[in-house]
Amino acid sequence: MFQQIEQLLAQFRPCFSRKAAFGWFVTVIAGFMLRGDHLGVTSVIRDLSLSPGCYELLIHFFHSDAWDPDVIRKTWWKLLAERAPVYRVKKRCILIGDGVKQSKEAFHMAGVKKLLQESENSSKPRYIFGHMFGAVGILIGRKGGKFCAPLQMNIQDGLRAVSSWMAPVFL
């Protein structure tokens, strides 16, 4: 299994302009596969028993210009199309979409908005501050068992304001 994972991850090497960035990509993927919680970069560091000094290096990796998320996404889509047993009905693949609202404590975090909760549970507040995530995946498998392989996930609303903060700098 490790050899298959290594071969799969090697397909992403051309997506990175620096060898070190690719090494951090492999580290992050391994951390995502093994982590026991969803606390971000600290989960990866803790579950892989990395030095606490790696925290800043991982943060830098996510802001690096040595890779482009669109190139990685297209490589992932290509690998799924070539290797995965895409489940089809009448020669058409099945796409699955969903959305979730994730509460955030920070009001001034990028992309955080006031969100209406559509719930019939009266113990939940009517509004929360958080992110609205949307995801789409493709159905993979055979008649005996199927699962959804993720294609893309992003914040659905609230980032337009963030992009306006990045005004050009005049010297």
Predicted regions: what is each one?
Residues 1-171:
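Conserved, well-structured functional cores that handle cations and Mg-NTP chemistry
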